[in-house]
Amino acid sequence: MATIHVDGKEYEVNGADNLLEACLSLGLDIPYFCWHPALGSVGACRQCAVKQYQNAEDTRGRLVMSCMTPASDGTFISIDDEEAKQFRESVVEWLMTNHPHDCPVCEEGGNCHLQDMTVMTGHSFRRYRFTKRTHRNQDLGPFISHEMNRCIACYRCVRYYKDYADGTDLGVYGAHDNVYFGRPEDGTLESEFSGNLVEICPTGVFTDKTHSERYNRKWDMQFAPSICQQCSIGCNISPGERYGELRRIENRYNGTVNHYFLCDRGRFGYGYVNLKDRPRQPVQRRGDDFITLNAEQAMQGAADILRQSKKVIGIGSPRASVESNFALRELVGEENFYTGIAHGEQERLQLALKVLREGGIYTPALREIESYDAVLVLGEDVTQTGARVALAVRQAVKGKAREMAAAQKVADWQIAAILNIGQRAKHPLFVTNVDDTRLDDIAAWTYRAPVEDQARLGFAIAHALDNSAPAVDGIEPELQSKIDVIVQALAGAKKPLIISGTNAGSLEVIQAAANVAKALKGRGADVGITMIARSVNSMGLGIMGGGSLEEALTELETGRADAVVVLENDLHRHASATRVNAALAKAPLVMVVDHQRTAIMENAHLVLSAASFAESDGTVINNEGRAQRFFQVYDPAYYDSKTVMLESWRWLHSLHSTLLSREVDWTQLDHVIDAVVAKIPELAGIKDAAPDATFRIRGQKLAREPHRYSGRTAMRANISVHEPRQPQDIDTMFTFSMEGNNQPTAHRSQVPFAWAPGWNSPQAWNKFQDEVGGKLRFGDPGVRLFETSENGLDYFTSVPARFQPQDGKWRIAPYYHLFGSDELSQRAPVFQCRMPQPYIKLNPADAAKLGVNAGTRVSFSYDGNTVTLPVEIAEGLTAGQVGLPMGMSGIAPVLAGAHLEDLKEAQQ
């Protein structure tokens, strides 16, 4: 710690910080542009000037840039010094000479750091009367709009895109006051994290194009704290709504998880919530048609049919909340509850959970991954299956430069010096996968092989680290030399990290990862292990347990069950569509509860229209076992009284109560959570994931809307001039209104949107943190359900045999895509142009045997259908395998590991 003196007052601060960080952490306001907590200091904009004095007696002082000055013990500075204030105002005036007067039409208006800093410096009159510099804007793809005339040359965008996210297609061109930030030519930004430019940019150069189509100001949107639903990582988000539509998603700061950044799937993939074909009222089949029901009719009709059924089973979902899956389990009984996950995937999920809970190895939070100094990724294409983890891995690799700089006593915020010292130095990263990955550019070595051979590599590494681990026979000398390099790197690391998961389709890969981690722990390393699952609540469903989807289908096929309730699950993704359809056709009652229109609704007798994450509350559990709560953003029935969309748990509990002819006793979310805790002790921690509905701050609920929210009385004027009462939230501590507490100093960690007096942009998160870039002042949201066990597991011994190609047979190797493999975000219209066209990847040798080239169309039979796809040649794919894009174009993820036998060139 250090003692600094600011405008005559004494403060204790972190001596490792610079003065700008220290003052912002104290709650003092200093304007800045080029500095960002995640990017460090370069002193480019000169906006954060303060007056520094030699001692208490010095009255003259000198101007210094606070972002480039250490917060040393005994420092005396003044923020309010007149010369410093005039200098800061003049800097803004210089920046404004070429900045357009377009705040009223700029999409950044009201959410703009430049506006905030201009007001903060007191600059209110422009003296520049000459021609402004102008630029041509670029088309940067479907996600981001580009308006270069608003640029103030702070360099944040390229520092984030190139230095932080390792992007290669955005740069700065030109010189002096005529610089251009963009691509060499028009085209879609290639980085999976390009959307963060929207929040990194302090002006309106980069804005959210998906928001442009249905634009409104930040102060006119309704927000709620939420969790990204598009993968298992559980990033915190702030969805914004207006007129019953999601308009945009912003990053919600969580110092333990995603801190300042999201991936593009999480930021832009929300379009499925706004689809017009979503079920909005319950419907029941009458012959070949469906009739619309109200809620009471739906409950009575379903109850009447279920009473006549001899056995009702329930099929849950890894994309449904803990509460909804539990409500289904209560409806049908624990013994009749099935997870809706394929048997193989469920085995892998249970193994991953076993490793995390009983393996004795620490599981780091997402942000902690950045602190590891050697990383081994076994089997996961992390950028496609858990993209935000990939960004954290990139920071871990860069830690070598910080380590070298620290040895020379260079502060962690001196980013330019760190980059100069580090040059190309990296901590070691080793990646195994069936083919190329997006992390290969920073990897020390990439091993491209079938999953058996990847697992064998992992087992061999574990044995080399600890000879009591099972040995692997038949390792080639060339591969052994690579294993020796990996072992040396992992053994020499202080904090090695092993990453694996369920998406490779191999139990042995997960076992090998666990063995490597155990071997490293035995050598005294502070080792971590991260498992990546498939869906937002895969871990929660795994903890809850239940039978596999195949077992559920068998119950229907044999007639032992004659009614089935399917919860938020497109079963065609987890099993053969032919088998699913045949099994459902045998059931007298098929009830579907979902917020998306799926193929299995064609087999449904009753459809209950569920609420999506934006219209409901619930709990999900991420890949590290962290329970996190998402909250309802808006009530769709407020805008259309005919809409009947309820949380899935509400539908299911209401049906359960109707069946038993009793009053509904789960009248609010807390009642469901209490029931979960009582029945499933392993999930007891979810009660602490967020405060209950009685939580108040000075007697107030928390506001979902900014206090400047406008137009509420006119929203429904086209329907009726009589304004209805605002929706009443009985489930949470939030209110559907601007009336409520929204102060940054209030004792809360569930924050709907970032705003503080004088801070309207995302930089307002500074006001919610215990120190800038640290944790939220009153704790980061969420709670870990399990910590590192004391004992640990024995070594796994099932070393697989080497992969052997078979004549006339090809095994399907899974290829995942950030844009397209996820069940929900692939429905977003904006993603359609980012999704790759369907393909089949072939090794060059296999292509030669078949007599086909790139672009040739080949066909194969699957599930009673003939599938025809164009060939792509994959040099890294081992012969005897074919690569298919999982989750796209009818290619269900369950296909991973299956075999094709009739692959041939398609008839023209």
Curated annotation (Swiss-Prot):
Top-level class of the enzyme under EC nomenclature: translocase
Cofactor remark: Binds 1 [2Fe-2S] cluster per subunit. Binds 3 [4Fe-4S] clusters per subunit.
Record-listed [4Fe-4S] cluster 2 binding positions: 151, 154, 157, 201
Summary of the function given for this chain in its UniProt record: NDH-1 shuttles electrons from NADH, via FMN and iron-sulfur (Fe-S) centers, to quinones in the respiratory chain. The immediate electron acceptor for the enzyme in this species is believed to be ubiquinone. Couples the redox reaction to proton translocation (for every two electrons transferred, four hydrogen ions are translocated across the cytoplasmic membrane), and thus conserves the redox energy in a proton gradient.
Domain (4Fe-4S Mo/W bis-MGD-type): residue spans on this chain: 221-277
Residues where [2Fe-2S] cluster binds: 34, 45, 48, 67
2Fe-2S ferredoxin-type domain: residues covered: 2-83
Subunit structure: Composed of 13 different subunits. Subunits NuoCD, E, F, and G constitute the peripheral sector of the complex.
Entry keyword annotation includes Repeat: no
Family stated for the protein in its record: Belongs to the complex I 75 kDa subunit family.
UniProt cross-references to PANTHER family, sorted A to Z: NADH-QUINONE OXIDOREDUCTASE SUBUNIT G, RESPIRATORY NITRATE REDUCTASE
Identification of the protein by name: NADH-quinone oxidoreductase subunit G
A Gene Ontology cellular-component term: oxidoreductase complex
One example GO MF annotation: metal ion binding
GO BP term (any one): ATP synthesis coupled electron transport
Binding sites annotated in the UniProt record for [4Fe-4S] cluster 1: 99, 103, 106, 112
Cofactor(s) demanded: [2Fe-2S] cluster; [4Fe-4S] cluster
Organism domain of life: Bacteria
Keywords: 2Fe-2S, 4Fe-4S, Iron, Iron-sulfur, Metal-binding, NAD, Quinone, Translocase, Ubiquinone
Segments forming a coiled coil: none
Known EC number: 7.1.1.-
Span of domain 4Fe-4S His(Cys)3-ligated-type: 83-122
